[in-house]
């Protein structure tokens, strides 16, 4: 026993004696071998220097970078999709696309970027319904689920085993018994409150489930910092949903802490459904270890919308990609704005590029409106958000807090012509660390509808004025600065 003790003691002594060496080694890894923002690099270096052991543990849990080649093997979906992309690129380069539709006039460069960076097809035959109330959204979703005939694909960051999912679960089990293929993809971190035995039970009932980034042990998650934040539903390739609502009772106003949950979700019919289907299947293949691309029938049955058509691209981003496509879309839209920018986000922690672009827009005479929640669901990001909002207030932007519950809506409208809504928050986590998906819609009617919704929300908002922000207490200022200082660690 004494020999074992001596071996352990020798190992501890060796580690402590070489702590500086290990710190230097990890510093080299962070600086030279990982693609990071310089602020993030310095934050991690300081943490490793001042808190060597705990800093190392935090780095293992939160700081590891991801590389596309290591984490995903993204395949071509079908030859004709690739062919269509090349044809669209040719038409954009030759400017023939201007013959197609006035709705993208002036945004050809953005359409081209989405094609090049993420193979996001521009589709033109889409219907869109906008939901801002959880009860209405889930009523429509459950009706569509009941009408499913071939397959149901569901992906949410958070699914809670409560009254809402109990209703959905009963429909899924019933449809599976009828021979409909049902797949549910969930994030390990977001669904950590649900026991694995519950998912196993659903599998036994015919509902296929898959966990994205499962923990090694129940409480040990080494990829905690990388979360699949996407919320996608695709049914028979006829209808799809994407937006901010997760699955839990708070999203249908049954949680006293938050009260009314204000979010935005899109119901889509048309060719854009295929973009969401491909996105779901890419994630499913990785999590479940399958290759659903060998099932060509899962990519058929796309039907055009039946009402007012709109142009749309489905874009996605994540730590597996070399470009931050959603971030770059927001940045390009801000820079192209000529009259107005409307932003709703629960978390406003932009990087320097987005922040500077918004400030330049304000100083150029463009009306910039930003709406955030009046209450926190995560205190850290809440106070960091207020710090960055303060910069925008002092620059002259119109900034508001939503006071009728919790604001979880995520998106931007520019010049009443283009809107970009989906799962991505206006923060560095969504841009660089989370797996996200948004819809870019080039349509004045839908854009104006979203502006009208924003204006309606202002009736229950409070404007953050310069006088109000300057007069905040010292305690609040300290909270803001500490949280802002730590935000690059994300």
Describe the residue ranges of each PLM region:
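N-terminal localization/anchoring segments of enzymes in phospholipid and broader phosphate metabolism
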Residues: 1-328, 332, 336, 360, ...
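Cytochrome P450 I-helix active-site segment
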Residues: 205, 367, 371-378, 385-386, ...
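A general structural signal for well-ordered alpha-helical packing
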Residues: 327, 334, 355, 368, ...
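Helical hairpin unit composed of two closely spaced alpha helices linked by a short loop
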Residues: 337-339, 347-369, 373, 378
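Thr-Gly-centered strand-to-loop micro-motif
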Residues: 343-345, 402, 421-422
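Histidine/acidic-residue-rich catalytic or RNA/ligand-binding cores of hydrolases
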Residues: 353-355, 382-384, 414
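Catalytic-core elements of nucleic-acid end-processing and repair enzymes
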Residues: 410
